[in-house]
């Protein structure tokens, strides 16, 4: 199976497994990826997801060998994106565990995620530049929002490889981890997020996503509206702090 779902506690790991194709995504694989994240979204027990590419490569993009074979990626204005879940807006966070290359459509999958944990020898890039294949899974939208227009233009126009250290320094990668540790460290981070009060975490995440399309006044109102909705959870947390929990920067209740 090119896509499988694994669960540990509140953390769901979606595994992309086409190592013989460097985890390039064809049409059926894109559909399976989208379905996997729909299952995650609808699972009340699942709080955070990790997307990981098996075999040492995150994803080499769309499988160009599938074009014209009946297994090509679906390209239409409606429905799922060509790479699968890239048009979805989930209510829960997703972390990309990046080993090896996250390039072309694979970069766009990583950009769709909320956070990116990258191994020290990982490489990001718009490698589809050399083939004349456009970014149509959110790359021209999410990349400049994430790292700024100037840096995004550099990556998009040149198609150059961006090593993990540079990606981290520009804010494209959120964590750098040793080679071979991306999945484990992403799942560890996911477990930490899953331990937080979830209504508040999801409300703040939604406010961050919404503010990109709103003026400041509207964004502030939206933030307050969501905050009111989960304030009871915050009051419980304040009571625990007053009782001595979580002092000195600790996330533990003791």
Language-model-detected regions and their locations in the chain:
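Glycine- (often His-adjacent) and acidic-residue-rich active-site loop
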Residues: 21, 31, 53-90, 102, ...
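Hydrophobic/basic alpha-helical segments enriched in Actinobacteria
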Residues: 43, 56, 73, 197-198, ...
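C-terminal alpha-helix plus adjacent terminal tail
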Residues: 1-9, 159-164, 184, 188-191, ...
């Amino acid at each position: 199976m090119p896509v499988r779902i694994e669960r540990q506690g509140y953390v769901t790991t979606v595994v992309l497994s086409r190592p013989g194709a460097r985890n390039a995504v064809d049409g059926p694989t894109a559909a399976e990826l989208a379905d996997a994240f729909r299952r995650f979204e609808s699972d009340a027990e699942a709080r955070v997801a990790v997307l990981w590419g098996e075999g040492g490569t995150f994803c080499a993009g769309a499988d160009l060998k599938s074009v014209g074979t009946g297994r090509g990626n679906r390209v239409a204005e409606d429905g799922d994106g060509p790479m699968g879940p890239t048009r979805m807006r989930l209510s829960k966070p997703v972390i990309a565990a990046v080993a090896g290359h996250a390039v072309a459509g694979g970069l766009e999958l990583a950009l769709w995620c909320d956070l990116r944990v990258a191994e020290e020898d990982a490489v990001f890039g718009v490698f589809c530049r050399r083939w004349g294949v456009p970014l149509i899974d959110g790359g021209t939208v999410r990349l400049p929002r994430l790292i700024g227009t100037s840096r995004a233009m550099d990556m998009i126009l040149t198609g150059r490889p961006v090593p993990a250290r540079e990606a981290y320094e520009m804010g494209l990668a959120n964590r750098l981890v040793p080679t071979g540790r991306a999945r484990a460290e992403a799942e560890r981070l996911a477990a930490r997020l899953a331990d937080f009060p979830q209504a508040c975490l999801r409300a703040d995440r939604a406010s961050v996503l919404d503010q990109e399309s709103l003026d400041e006044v509207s964004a502030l109102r939206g933030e307050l509206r969501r905050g009111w909705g989960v304030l009871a959870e915050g009051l419980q947390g304040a009571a625990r702090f007053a009782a001595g929990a979580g002092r000195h920067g600790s996330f533990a209740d003791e």
